[in-house]
Structure formats: C-alpha cells, structure tokens
C-alpha cells in the first residue's frame, strides 16, 4: 500500500508537466503562417489583434510562412511578398517571436525581401537555431496546398525537412503500450510502474518526488 501514494504523486506531476510543456509562437499580422508540423496552422487571437499565437510542442517543429509588409503610398497600401519559407527549429517551454527586416519603402522591400534575413527569438531575445529553405512551386501560385507541399518537401530530405507525423505518433504512444504490458505481466505492478514513470520524469519532477517521499 505504501507504494501507491508516491506512485500517484509522480504520475500526477509527470502528466501535469506534459500538459503545460509547450512553445508559444507569436505571429505578427504581416506574417501568414500556412502550416505548422504538417497541418494547416490554427492561430489564436482576436480578429484585429496585431499578433496571434499558436501552441507548438516542445522539441523540433516545422513551419511554412510568408512575410508581407505593407507600405502607404498616397491613398493606397502596397504589400510586398517574400518567398514562401519552410523552416525547422527546436525549442522548449518558451515564447518565440519573429524578428523580421524593416524596409524604408516598398521599392526597397521589392529589391531586398527575396533575400531577407529573419530570426525566431526567445523571451531573452536570443535567436533560436533554425534551418530554412524556400518552398518553391512552379506555375500557378493561386490555391497552393502548402501542407501537401511541405509533406513532399520532407520526402526529399531538404535542409529544413523533418520526419513524418506517423513516426512521431508511434513514438508518443509506445510508452502507453509498455505500461499496459507491465500491468498485466507482473506481481510487482505498482513498483514497476513507479520505476517506469520515475525514469521518464525530468530532474525537477524527480526532486519534487524525492521531497514528497521524505516527508
């Protein structure tokens, strides 16, 4: 019986940590985020907000986006589009913001935006390491399926390619199957589960667990 209480504790702490662990990407209104990790990007935020957000998992992520700053000329607003960019990066438990070039006017933007330098920066202003490429499609550009293009790009193994969603899902569900097998197999079920979840916990969770046991 004594093993059940600490087991419940570490399970709760581990699940809580997994639920809150995420990367928040802030997307300004002059950036169109088409795809995140192979899926059409679903942003949160009010209609007229200057930026919106999307929650991404910790670890490696891939995005497809386009930058389009606008410039006033008389009564008109002129937008200048960058290339469609596919990029991958890794981050954990942080907020990220785009750091994008600013241009004096639309003429300068038209000359320079295709070779623009950009970054993703964290809460401390440090740039996140990334790999990027252009997501190029010849011919008609209207009605592009960016999710499909990203999947095709990943198959080519480009510098910004990531693994498929299927392999990620398999990795995530595998520990659950292992737990179920252990529950059915052994007489020492509680102890085995305790060891399993303790090994999976991060150092902060392990420290809290040890403090709880020593009470």
Swiss-Prot record:
Q: Point out the signal peptide segment.
A: 1-21
**Keywords, sorted A to Z:** Signal
Which Pfam families does the protein's record reference?
A: DUF2057
Disulfide bonds listed in the record:
none
Recorded hits in InterPro entries, A to Z, give: UPF0319
Family to which this protein belongs: Belongs to the UPF0319 family.
UniProt-recorded name of the protein: UPF0319 protein VV2_0960
């Amino acid at each position: 019986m004594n093993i059940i209480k600490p087991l419940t504790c570490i399970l709760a702490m581990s699940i809580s940590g997994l639920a809150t662990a995420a990367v928040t990407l802030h997307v300004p209104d002059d950036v169109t985020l088409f795809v995140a990790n192979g899926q059409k990007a679903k942003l949160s935020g009010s209609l007229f907000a200057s930026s919106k957000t999307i929650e991404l998992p910790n670890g490696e992520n891939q995005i497809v986006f386009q930058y389009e700053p606008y410039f006033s000329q008389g009564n008109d607003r002129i937008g200048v589009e960058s290339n469609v960019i596919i990029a991958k990066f890794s981050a954990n438990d942080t907020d990220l913001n785009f750091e994008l070039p600013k241009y004096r006017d639309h003429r300068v933007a038209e000359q320079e935006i295709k070779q623009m330098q950009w970054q993703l920066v964290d809460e401390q202003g440090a740039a996140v390491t990334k790999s990027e490429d252009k997501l190029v499609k010849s011919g008609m550009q209207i009605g592009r399926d960016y999710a499909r293009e990203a999947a095709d790009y990943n198959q080519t193994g480009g510098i910004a390619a990531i693994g498929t969603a299927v392999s990620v899902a398999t990795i995530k569900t595998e520990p659950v199957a292992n737990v179920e097998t252990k529950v059915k197999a052994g007489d020492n079920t509680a102890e085995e589960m305790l060891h399993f979840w303790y090994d999976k916990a991060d150092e902060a969770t392990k420290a809290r667990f040890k403090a709880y046991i020593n009470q």
